[in-house]
Amino acid sequence: MTIIQKIKQKEKLMNRRNFLKFNALTLASMGVAYANPMHDMHSMHKNHSINHDLDTSFINFAPKNLKLLDPKQFPQGEILKALPLLKNESKEKNIFRATLEIKENHIELIKGKKTLFYTYNGLVPAPKIEVFEGDKLEILVKNKLKEATTIHWHGVPVPPDQDGSPHDPILAGEERIYRFEIPQDSAGTYWYHPHPHYTASKQVFMGLAGAFVIKAKKDALSHLKEKDLMISDLRLDENAQIPNNNLNDWLNGREGEFVLINGQFKPKIKLATNERIRIYNATAARYLNLRIQGAKFILVGTDGGLIEKAIYKEELFLSPASRVEVLIDAPKDGNFKLESAYYDRDKMMVKEESNTLFLANINLKKEKLELPKNLKIFKPLEEPKEFKEIIMSEDHMQMHGMMGKSESELKIALASMFLINGKSYDLKRIDLSSKLGVVEDWIVINKSHMDHPFHIHGTQFELISSKLNGKVQKAEFRAFRDTINVRPNEELRLRMKQDFKGLRMYHCHILEHEDLGMMGNLEVKE
């Protein structure tokens, strides 16, 4: 009997009152059934479908003898600049109308050398979109690239046909208008990036990523000044050009050698302890474990906006695509260093030293601040009526003898390696279905040897519990998210519902893994 069947059987045996108390601790009592997925993983790997379009032409490799840019050539230590704002072309109340032109642009980051980027409106970093709950958006997107693209409004609850999925490409030379209304109670820190079939990772590392902030007319912290820290990374060769991925990038996700904040390398940041800071992990695969020696973070928000109460943190863990809202607490004025401590995510075929990464110098001014006891009233979802199981895995048979394979064999192996429920992604296949407005619990299980951040389109979820090495833990605090890390052999219980009918994606947000097939299609029906 599978975990899903056991849960449903348990629900039938329990009366309504007791079922409302049914939680992750009950799941733990199921023992082996909860610890083991519903399919035998060996047979899944043996029989997984590789009949999808195995077009491996998108898998390109950088030269093996590639020489990278000397870090000393990259300007550093400059005062951090604010993100540019996307101009609202409308003068109508509650209407945000704008244009995003996606095009190549040569930008001089390195003195005397211009780097070819993909850009939104010619800018790196991209312009920040700032809107309010209830606003209606009309964004004209002109694709001036030589390839198809989309814009995915990551985490923003929009209808499926406006979500920039790989099913709705904007072909080279074409344009379209994205139209959607920002729902009430959706204030939070989001971002936008491409989501075309096979090439999301390339288009992001070429420069396409921007901040997207939804504000409430009034919330517990709306009186505070704000700053954005959009963290990305960049790889440049000795000619200051952005090279293709190497094999390790395809296996583990690309981590550029230059970690940037708002497009700047090791900047100086002026902050005050009464500033609301939005931090974005806009990298393809880099995990961030942020800390400020001599100071603490005050966590006030996650992907989906403010949390119930402020939480003091020595470190902030952000998997790729995650965002947080914080303030900084320090005993006095001073100069501090923003760093990212090493996080071992069990990469394939790579040995790393556990080095701490220096990101920026912070000049911090101590200001008076009284945080309210409660930041937001959390409105939990109802108890679940349906359950789903997601198994993220890797086909180790494809990895066998990899270093001895030809380039064409490597490409085929890569395109068949990263799986969800034993399958590699097929654009035309429906993998799961959900009912509109019905609350579901998803059990997301990582049966691979490395970390994978799980992301779902169209909604946000609440983490209910996690299980690792037989130990079940309830979530540390209540919050809505759209992206969450899943460690090797870990099981997460996520509660969610979909409020729009149509097709959605769920996938690993290491973008190379997404492109290589660690993704599925969810059909939402009435």
Predicted features along the sequence, with ranges:
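Terminal connector regions
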Residues: 198-201, 333-359, 509-517
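N-terminal secretory signal peptides
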Residues: 1-18, 22-33, 40-43
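Exposed beta-strand face motif in extracellular beta-rich ectodomains
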Residues: 188-190, 334-336, 502-504
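Extracellular beta-strand-rich recognition modules
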Residues: 141, 279, 338-340, 507
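Active-site pocket scaffolds in enzymes
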Residues: 40-41, 155, 161-166, 170, ...
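Histidine-centered copper-binding motifs that mark active-site loops
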Residues: 39-320, 326, 332, 358-400, ...
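Polar/charged side chains located within well-ordered beta-strands of beta-rich proteins
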Residues: 23, 275, 340, 388, ...
